[in-house]
Amino acid sequence: PFNVGGLDKFGTLN
C-alpha cells in the first residue's frame, strides 16, 4: 500500500 484507503500505484487496494 502506498495510498491508504485507496489504490496504490500498482492499482491494488490498500
Swiss-Prot record:
The conditions that induce or repress this protein are given as: By pathogen infection.
Keywords of the record, alphabetical order, are: Hydrolase
Which tissues and organs express this gene's product? Answer: Expressed in stem, vascular tissues and tobacco mosaic virus infected leaves.
Q: Which GO terms describe its biological process?
A: phenylpropanoid biosynthetic process
| Keyword set includes Hydrolase | yes
- The domain of life for this entry's organism is Eukaryota
Return one GO MF term. Answer: hydrolase activity
Task: Give the protein name, as stated in the record.
Answer: Feruloyl-CoA thioesterase
